[in-house]
Amino acid sequence: MRVRKRKGAEKHLANNPHYVILNPEDAKGRWHDVFGNDRPIHIEVGSGKGGFITGMALKNPDINYIGIDIQLSVLSYALDKVLASEVPNVKLLRVDGSSLTNYFEDGEVDMMYLNFSDPWPKTKHEKRRLTYKDFLDTYKRILPEHGEIHFKTDNRGLFEYSLASFSQYGMTLRQIWLDLHASNYEGNVMTEYEEKFSNKGQVIYRVEANF
């Protein structure tokens, strides 16, 4: 998700250290201390404007959520949603998805969400896709044994690529939805992007996979 640069975004994040962890490397291995409890930790890589992570936190107060995005302006909009919702079980990080092992110990994260990641359609950009094998190496380290990834996209090419990447990595594809919104799946929390494009008739794909 690309958004216009937001004036004051950096200051906005800096002024809310309760929600925005400015030095996440210091939290490595002690995220339960950061949250002040021993509840499960779920992360969303590429959290966009925060609709999903906030919605999940409201729905599941017994789970700790961490929204991760590298874009400063985007993360500032996510912070707006977190502040408006007053959810106590959300933290936000401005870091790159390829560097997660710098901020989480092995097995410290209980579940991961990848929602509407950049498809990087050109073959020469394959290594930038968040479901490329090098990213899977990183995810496997920070997740527990048989850790889960829940992946959603509206891009058929990226979905097919990701299914193949998961399978080739040796992951188990537990459930697959080829048209999520036409299915009987309950409990879906939509991102802003998902809501916008599904209303235009765009098909949404989803898979749950574990290592």
From Swiss-Prot:
It catalyses: guanosine(46) in tRNA + S-adenosyl-L-methionine = N(7)-methylguanosine(46) in tRNA + S-adenosyl-L-homocysteine. Its EC number is 2.1.1.33. The lineage of its organism: Bacteria, Bacillati, Bacillota, Bacilli, Lactobacillales. InterPro entries: SAM-dependent_MTases_sf (IPR029063), tRNA_(Gua-N-7)_MeTrfase_Trmb (IPR003358), tRNA_methyltr_TrmB_bact (IPR055361). It is an enzyme of class 2 (transferase). Substrate binds at residues 122, 154, 191-194. The active site is at residue 118. Keywords: Methyltransferase, S-adenosyl-L-methionine, Transferase, tRNA processing. NCBIfam families: PRK00121.2-2, tRNA (guanosine(46)-N7)-methyltransferase TrmB. GO terms for cellular component: tRNA methyltransferase complex. Catalyzes the formation of N(7)-methylguanine at position 46 (m7G46) in tRNA. S-adenosyl-L-methionine binds at residues 44, 69, 96, 118. It comes from the Bacteria. GO terms for molecular function: tRNA (guanine(46)-N7)-methyltransferase activity. Belongs to the class I-like SAM-binding methyltransferase superfamily. TrmB family. This is tRNA (guanine-N(7)-)-methyltransferase. Residues 124-129 are annotated as: Interaction with RNA. Pathway: tRNA modification; N(7)-methylguanine-tRNA biosynthesis.
